[in-house]
Amino acid sequence: PQAPILSRKMDDEKKERLRRAWAEATAGNRRRSREVKIGSVAIGAGHPVAVQSMTDRNTNDTEACIAQTGRIRQAGGRIVRLTTQGLREAESMRIIAAEVRRRWPDTALVADVHFVPQVADAVAAFADKVRINPGNYNDRGGSFEALLEKCRRSGAALRIGVNHGSLSPKMVGLYGDTPEGMVESAMEYLRICRREGFDRVVISMKSSNTRVMVHAYRMLVAAMHLEGMDYPLHLGVTEAGSGLEGRIKSAVGIGALLADGVGDTIRVSLTEPPENEIPAAQAITAHFAAATASEGTFRRGQEALREPFAYSRRLTASVGRIGGDNPPLLRSELLADEADALHDGRIAVIEAVGPHPVEEWREAIVRMDAAGDRRPVILKRTYPSCDRTELAMQAAADFGVMFIDGLADGIWIESAAGTPQADTDSIALDILQASRARMSKTEFISCPGCGRTLYALQDTLAVVKERLSHLKGLKIAVMGCIVNGPGEMADADYGYVGAAPGRITLYRGKEPVRRNIPQEDALDALIALL
């Protein structure tokens, strides 16, 4: 087997090879990827970025899943995923698939499999795509090569879906809980796919932490490029939450990659009815479709990314409370002397006015670095939309990557339509929080729910937000079940996780502190832990 490009202590030569590979793979408008068909939906190879969602009903409730699939399709989503945690659910999905194909024949169905390889083998016979998680696929035995053969015979595609919170013990032991571990987890399976001549493969590298997510996808693109692989990518931020905050967080992570032409299909995971995810995803893809359709090279300023795979704050001088090691500020937060510094040029404002704001901002920073200019940088852009959600998602998709990469010291969002400054300031703070640059409020990490969810997730999240939103800087996770729950909330201070029907386990950090308590007592018990 080929030696991994990654190692726990990667030397400078390997890092430089990966950096060059990333730059080469993203040199054009869009990363080149092969075409993969998921049922009748073609992704990769220049096809428009596809949007998708996942049902949140028990898969054995076939009528509810069929109805929900119809609502997703009506909203514009042609790829729909269902959870198949056991053979009973696999058989239920077979029934669902037959009816969905009768009613909506252009809809592709994806089976989501964790822990039980035998289920993956079963659904490969009728699903348009099978999703497996390398972190738990072999926990109970099973041959990956045999699954590939079943997919080959049926025409099913395969998604190798890596989750930051559920890496295998082997990968955690070799690389730690890191983007490197995520990438090597995927590459191990991709090398088998190539060896077996199976190329109907899609990969995802999801995390609830946008920095980790972006770094993992970038490193995967580079690692695949070095090994001559061009598989398409499915993008998403896990456990993004709900409402405007959830949409902003998804736009920050997904937009950071689409800005560099990376991504072939996306999901905006929201703790809301799944059909709500489709217009949110369409807003992101439309924003970048408009940019890439315009004239221009769309890839200048890459030199600003000195370290694409890890956070590295750009070195700037401090002027009052901005620049240096200070957290990024909003334009409206500048004090009188700092505002004077803005007007007399001691603070640089880089305003993007063209269709490619990330490119404009990066180019300007490259010029400043070349000139030895270490003034603090405030990024500025004016948006025409009068719709608050649209403005927020566009701004998040543009500004987020700049703060994920540590390239700016301040943010300035203007609205040509007269959106109140209080609203644009609130959006700016949410962007900074989503990009991990500055915490200004409680952060809620919550999964969208699926057929494994063990309680009324959306209602519970609403109550948790109502009672705990005043705890600035605290991260609280509300998770539907134990499959991704404990892992994907590893970044949280406290967690509320479904353990069994009507039962909740509470976590402090990564440790369970109250197990299997009645749901009606769980929120009060969580508050008592704080």
Each PLM stretch: what is its role?
Residues 51, 112, 160, 203, ...:
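Conserved, mostly hydrophobic/aromatic
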Residues 163, 171-313, 345-471, 475-478:
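Catalytic alpha/beta core domains of metabolic enzymes, predominantly
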Residues 45-64, 83-85, 107-115, 135, ...:
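Active-site mouth loops of central-metabolism enzymes
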Residues 56, 74-100, 134-139, 201-210, ...:
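Glycine-rich, proline-tolerant flexible connector loops at the mouths of alpha/beta enzymes
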Residues 8-53, 152-153, 290-334, 462, ...:
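N-terminal amphipathic alpha-helix/helix-capping segment at the start of soluble metabolic enzymes
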Residues 59-71, 115-121, 186, 250-254, ...:
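Short, acidic/polar
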Residues 87-111, 147-156, 220-229, 368-372, ...:
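Alpha-helix-loop-beta-strand connector modules within alpha/beta enzyme cores
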